[in-house]
Amino acid sequence: MYKLVLIRHGESTWNKENRFTGWVDVDLTEQGRNEAYQAGELLKEAGYTFDIAYTSVLKRAIRTLWHVQDKMDLMYLPVVHSWRLNERHYGALSGLNKAETAAKFGDEQVLVWRRSYDTPPPALEPTDERAPFNDPRYAKVPREQLPLTECLKDTVARVLPLWNESIAPAVRAGKQVLIAAHGNSLRALIKYLDGISDSDIVGLNIPNGVPLVYELDENLKPIKHYYLGDQDAIAQAQAAVAKQGKAG
């Protein structure tokens, strides 16, 4: 049996402001930093250790990983930073308040943009300052692979090459792997691992800063998965994530 640990970054400044974030590189709040430290404490107390970690190229995930490593005394851990683990790109919604957007377009439309599998939000114009083309962190990524908007289907297609070419081989080699990423890049991976249908994935909400453990068989198929921590608090956090895109 193999184990894989996933963690969504701690609360970011735009999570706190209920704004669509996507590829915008915002930082953690004080609460977000505390969530990351608490995640590290939970993992340490439960006896976990790691051989390698994967994260995105966005600071809220990177800093979450740092805090986990610090708490676990694993600052020396090899870390792979990949744009493929970035949050889903929210296109022209990037930076907008979710509740205000829902008030303007309706809860149903915003739910489709946030959670449907194959409907992307309106795209950015290529000349928009939020477009990734001139960002140095993507200098080595072919321009045609850089998104101006994404649906979850696009995010799955972006994440899976990293899983197939790097993460899965590391797990099969017996390495203890930690992935610190984002709500939708983790939803994309979980959809693949658990074989969740396109319609059922709408209901999956991942709380900030809570370790999610996957136990996998020899074919890397899930045996079971579970969050570490106070289960009632985790359920409340998941419900709060689900409510973010509603006008009321």
Curated annotation (Swiss-Prot):
Record keyword Isomerase present: yes
Catalysed reactions, as listed in the record: (2R)-2-phosphoglycerate = (2R)-3-phosphoglycerate
Residue numbers binding substrate: 8-15, 21-22, 60, 87-90, 98, 114-115, 183-184
GO molecular function, one term: phosphoglycerate mutase activity
Annotated site, Transition state stabilizer, chain positions: H182
Associated pathway: Carbohydrate degradation; glycolysis; pyruvate from D-glyceraldehyde 3-phosphate: step 3/5
E.C. number(s) listed in UniProt: 5.4.2.11
Pfam family, one: His_Phos_1
Active site: H9 (tele-phosphohistidine intermediate), E87 (proton donor/acceptor)
Role summary: Catalyzes the interconversion of 2-phosphoglycerate and 3-phosphoglycerate.
Subunit: Homodimer.
Family: Belongs to the phosphoglycerate mutase family. BPG-dependent PGAM subfamily.
Cited PANTHER family: PHOSPHOGLYCERATE MUTASE
UniProt protein name: 2,3-bisphosphoglycerate-dependent phosphoglycerate mutase
